């Protein structure tokens, strides 16, 4: 083992010892020194400890370290943005509302060598900065202006966190941006799912028609995401749209997926509908309804009725599904 590697491991072990033995005040001085180090991995460990202890007094040191790693050679000092990710997480956690570091991180691109070329390792950093910016000193309009670029970021994680950040701003303009993002689409299912869920949280009544457009059995994954968004909403029209879809002739795999989303519904109608499925529909759909009901907030309210319906159908598979779904928690 080289001397430099041994020295780094010793320093990291010293930080681990701080976590085990020190309170925040005793850790402040050694952590201030650690944040000034040139090794990104080591600084990432120090920043995580600052976050752990909630040391607001070290906010200037966190900012200085973040700016230093932005300005130096990233491949040598901070590969994979180890330090920068941890520094932004610490700044956000201890409540730093100064927007400057988050705005700089939002624009940072870090190309690193990979097999066959280069890849950007800063997507997650841009996403973290987006989420932190929501709690910054800026106005909602300024925040949304800065976040808009992330909705079309080349990196999937940055786009996903960008959608989440826009939704957290929770302004009418947020809904417009998310509506536009939904209409233009995204190649990654997780991003589209987040858009649909966010719209049904921000403006449920105005979003039902748009979200329901994605109830397309030809795209099972997208259809399931739309069903989940509608099912989780507190708006009766959202439930009605999902119910209308479930009454259509759709493949059983799609039907099962849509039924399972009703476990998240806050509306009493959902529990009542699941009982009708248990009573009247084919075993595969009834099993999904039993599973959904057992995971729902109406579990205890409808346990007895569901047990009676399962007993009436005299099907071993449904009995097994009921026993699994309503097993003691």
Task: Indicate where each model-derived feature is located.
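Generic beta-strand or strand-like secondary-structure segments
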Residues: 61-68, 86-93, 101-104, 128
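Internal amphipathic alpha-helical repeat/solenoid segments
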Residues: 25-42, 57-76
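Structural detector for internal amphipathic alpha-helices that build alpha-solenoid repeat scaffolds
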Residues: 2-23, 41-57, 73-96, 116-138, ...
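Buried hydrophobic core positions in alpha-solenoid tandem helical repeats
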Residues: 30-32, 61-66, 101-106, 146-148, ...
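Amphipathic alpha-helical segments of tetratricopeptide repeats
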Residues: 108-112
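TPR/TPR-like (Sel1-like) alpha-helical repeat modules
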Residues: 66-67, 107, 217-218, 279-283, ...
């Amino acid at each position: 083992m080289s001397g430099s590697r041994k020295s780094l491991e010793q320093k990291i072990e010293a930080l681990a010892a701080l976590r085990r033995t020190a309170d925040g005040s005793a850790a402040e001085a050694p952590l201030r020194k650690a944040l000034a180090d040139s090794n990104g991995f080591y600084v990432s460990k120090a920043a995580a400890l600052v976050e752990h202890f909630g040391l607001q007094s070290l906010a200037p040191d966190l900012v200085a370290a973040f700016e230093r790693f932005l300005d130096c050679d990233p491949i040598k000092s901070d590969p994979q943005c180890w330090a920068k990710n941890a520094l932004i997480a610490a700044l956000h956690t201890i409540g730093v509302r100064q927007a400057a570091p988050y705005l700089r991180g939002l624009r940072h691109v870090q190309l690193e060598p990979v097999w066959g070329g280069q890849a950007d390792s800063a997507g997650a950093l841009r996403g973290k900065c987006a989420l932190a910016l929501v709690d910054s000193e800026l106005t909602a309009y300024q925040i949304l202006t800065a976040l808009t670029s992330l909705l079309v970021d080349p990196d999937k994680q940055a786009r996903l966190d960008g959608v989440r950040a826009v939704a957290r701003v929770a302004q009418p303009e947020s809904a417009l941006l998310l509506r536009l993002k939904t209409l233009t689409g995204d190649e990654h299912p997780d991003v589209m799912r987040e858009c649909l869920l966010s719209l049904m949280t921000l403006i449920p009544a105005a979003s039902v028609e748009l979200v329901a457009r994605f109830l397309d059995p030809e795209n099972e994954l997208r259809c399931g995401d739309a069903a989940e968004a509608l099912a989780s909403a507190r708006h009766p029209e959202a439930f009605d749209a999902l119910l209308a879809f479930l009454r259509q002739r759709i493949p059983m795999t799609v039907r099962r997926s849509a039924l399972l989303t009703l476990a998240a519904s806050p509306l009493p109608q959902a529990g009542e509908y699941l009982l009708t499925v248990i009573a009247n529909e084919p075993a595969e759909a009834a099993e999904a309804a039993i599973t959904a009901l057992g995971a729902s907030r109406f579990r205890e309210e409808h346990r007895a009725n569901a047990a009676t319906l399962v007993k009436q159908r005299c099907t071993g598979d449904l009995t097994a599904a009921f026993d699994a779904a309503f097993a003691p928690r």
